[in-house]
Amino acid sequence: MKNKVLFIIALLTFQLHAVSEEGLHHYIKEYMTKKLHSPITKIETISSYPIQGTHGWEVYFLSMNIEGKKRAISKVVFTKGNKISFSLKDKSKKEYKDILKPKVPDSSYDDKHLLVGDKDAKHKILVLSDPFCPYCQEIVPKLIDDVKSNPKVFALYYYHLPLLRIHPASDTATRAMLIFQKRGDIKHLKDCYHLLVSPREINADVVLKAIKDKTGIKIKRVEIYSDEINRELKSDRKLKKRLMVTGTPTIFIDGLWDPTREGYKKYLKK
């Protein structure tokens, strides 16, 4: 398959060998410093892997710290041999930077995030979800049920990603879900996807009442705002940033992003 590649740049014209990761960092650091008119103080590779069907192209997901800036910025770069490109398109003219994401780090598959399934299952699924996201409400409860019915096939790792700007009620609901998750109470965690309360509700007491009405379980404010719950939410947000996730639900199968959100179904028993 021939790919249209834009902005291909030779790292060093006299080099004949492939670009090393160190060489890539050096070039990108100098290039971005000139472009941003600010020094890049740190650059690291978050994830990299060969792109199937591209005859040797690899994708690098980079994180860069800029002098004077609190937040790191991300950059997607493609390499092949001694070439570097900021743009690579597939046969249908889609930008690979729009259809690829970093691989899930192995450390994310830990016991505290294993919601259902066997940790030694053939396939690992990781989901980032918001209980008030309409697509999440449609997809995620079914995903949980499918994994629960096929524990030897799948292990489902659940991360919370409340979209607070559009669903402020998700803050309280997500905190309650973390409590249910820690208790191993999958049923009531799923119930939080169908609460009779506005997604725009900002009063925690109103949302907690909706949770009690739906589940029969009373959760106190002091429980949802504990240091432990705060740490868990902060940890989940870090993964969102690492994986360059921008919306929900975002699903990864065996480490790779599944933009269809249904890729796991091909492994279900017929």
Which residues does each predicted region cover?
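C-terminal cap of thioredoxin/glutaredoxin-like
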Residues: 19-86, 200, 209-270
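Extracytoplasmic
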Residues: 55-57, 72, 111, 120, ...
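A short, surface-exposed interaction/processing loop segment used at functional sites
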Residues: 80-108
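A short beta-strand-turn-helix
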Residues: 106-123, 148
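Structural alpha/beta surface segment adjacent to cysteine/selenocysteine redox centers
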Residues: 126-131, 137-215, 241-247
